[in-house]
Structures are given as C-alpha cells and as structure tokens.
C-alpha cells in the first residue's frame, strides 16, 4: 500500500498509453470516460467524485475526456468495450489487457454504486 493517494490521471490518449498504465497498476485502476457536453456524465459526476475520494492508496483513478482522448475512446468502442459515455472501467492488478474486469455504462446511480462496490 502506498503512503499517499496517487493523483487522478487524465491523459490516456491511446491504446498503448492504456496498456502502459495497466503495467504499473498497484492493485486497481478505475477509469471514467466522459465529456464536458455529456448530460448523463454530469448526473453521475458527484457520485464518481465521492467514490474516488474514498479510494485506498493502491487504487489509481482516471477521468478521461473523450474529446481530448478520442483515439482511446475510438479504440475501446471498436472493441465493443464501450458503447458511449459515461462509462466506468475497472482493471485489477494483473490485467494488462485492454479488456476490463468490470464495466458499467450510463447514468443509473444504482448501477454506478454497485460497480464501485463490486470493484472494491
């Protein structure tokens, strides 16, 4: 376990950057894909922020704006991992592949909370 909480990562531009990020996974990585213009993203923003604040030090959190990281979003979409935004992805420590261990899409509070409870 790390002594300090890692910063929220916001710059995962493409698939190779995602795979590089997964290689340094200290225990768990949670990535939120969204956009400034996305209404459903705004609906779950405070819920996701609260969960991110409660994360232990061995969890990396990432908030990816699909407009600035469109190559990554496009890659995940072509692999049918994401359908749209918002989407939350969970990767456990030994997963070094782009396919997540858990995923939830949409702005349903119950599904978002259940996702975090499952992942932790």
Which residue ranges define each predicted feature?
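N-terminal leader/targeting and pre-domain segments
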Residues: 1-29, 111-120
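Intrinsic disorder
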Residues: 12, 35, 103-107
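Local sequence-structure signature of Cys/Sec-based thiol-disulfide redox active-site neighborhoods
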Residues: 17-53
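Eukaryotic short linear interaction motifs
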Residues: 39-40, 69-72, 97, 110-113
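Structured loop/turn residues at beta-strand edges in well-structured enzyme cores
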Residues: 57, 80-83
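Short amphipathic alpha-helix with an adjacent loop that forms part of the alpha/beta core around
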Residues: 20-22, 73-80
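Thiol-based oxidoreductase modules, predominantly thioredoxin-like and allied folds used
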Residues: 9-13, 33, 45-52, 56-73
